[in-house]
């Protein structure tokens, strides 16, 4: 394969034991990364490459949203927004190929373990018990009768 783009002409292996589909154009991530401007904007969503340059002015969230995800894997951002089935259907018209199998990240466990998602709510492990203790203290003082000294 020469360059960053390859077209699979027959079903088979890519030389690394990974199956490639027939008549699919494969792009390397480095090729996609070059397409990150208003003149040419490509996105990767679930291993598929989309040229959304024509869609920039039509995107309901504005062109800035697309520019932020240009040239990279935008799968997580795409899913986080919760696009409608109409938006997913519309996306098909911008499909130009797939990411080369050797550039694909594994679907299961694809998150970087150094970026622990549970730590986003670490504050809850400290703040909520403190608030609960303070609340219990106030309730205890409010509902217990004051002791009278003789």
From Swiss-Prot:
Subcellular location field: Mitochondrion outer membrane
GO BP term, example: nitric oxide biosynthetic process
Chain positions found as N6-acetyllysine: 34
Residues forming coiled coils: none
N6-methyllysine: residues carrying this PTM: 39
Binding of heme, residues: 59, 83
Modified residues (Phosphoserine): 23, 37, 84
Transmembrane segments: 122-144
Any one GO MF annotation of this record: heme binding
Domain Cytochrome b5 heme-binding: start-end pairs: 24-100
UniProt-listed SMART domains: Cyt-b5
Keyword Heme attached: yes
One Pfam family hit: Cyt-b5
Chain spans, region Disordered: 1-21
Sorted UniProt keywords: Acetylation, Electron transport, Heme, Iron, Membrane, Metal-binding, Methylation, Mitochondrion, Mitochondrion outer membrane, Phosphoprotein, Transmembrane, Transmembrane helix, Transport
UniProt main location, coarse: mitochondrion
Prosegment location in residue numbers: 1-15
Record-linked Gene3D superfamilies: Cytochrome b5-like heme/steroid binding domain
One CC-aspect GO term: mitochondrial outer membrane
Family: Belongs to the cytochrome b5 family.
Known role: Cytochrome b5 is a membrane-bound hemoprotein functioning as an electron carrier for several membrane-bound oxygenases.
Quaternary context: Component of a complex composed of cytochrome b5, NADH-cytochrome b5 reductase (CYB5R3) and MTARC2.
Protein name in UniProt: Cytochrome b5 type B
Protein encoded by which gene: CYB5B
